[in-house]
Swiss-Prot record:
It comes from Cereibacter sphaeroides (strain ATCC 17023 / DSM 158 / JCM 6121 / CCUG 31486 / LMG 2827 / NBRC 12203 / NCIMB 8253 / ATH 2.4.1.) (Rhodobacter sphaeroides). Gene3D superfamilies: 4.10.410.60. One of its GO terms (molecular function) is structural constituent of ribosome. GO terms for biological process: translation. PANTHER family: 54S RIBOSOMAL PROTEIN BL35M (PTHR33343), LARGE RIBOSOMAL SUBUNIT PROTEIN BL35M (PTHR33343:SF1). The keyword Signal does not apply. This is Large ribosomal subunit protein bL35. The lineage of its organism: Bacteria, Pseudomonadati, Pseudomonadota, Alphaproteobacteria, Rhodobacterales. Keywords: Ribonucleoprotein, Ribosomal protein.
Amino acid sequence: MPKMKTKSAAKKRFSFTATGKVKAGPAGKRHGMIKRSTKFIRDVTGTMILSDADAKIVKKYMPYDR
């Protein structure tokens, strides 16, 4: 049976912590930031840990990165 392929879109957007949790950058900061509040801009910086349900889906896309 051939090896499974990693989804290219997933490997560009997600990374794993040492404990196996999935990290991602929050959405909503590409454009239109002038009309956003300062609190919103501050809250969407950095990375966040995905929920268990979302992490399960992402792990299927990246079979060899854990």
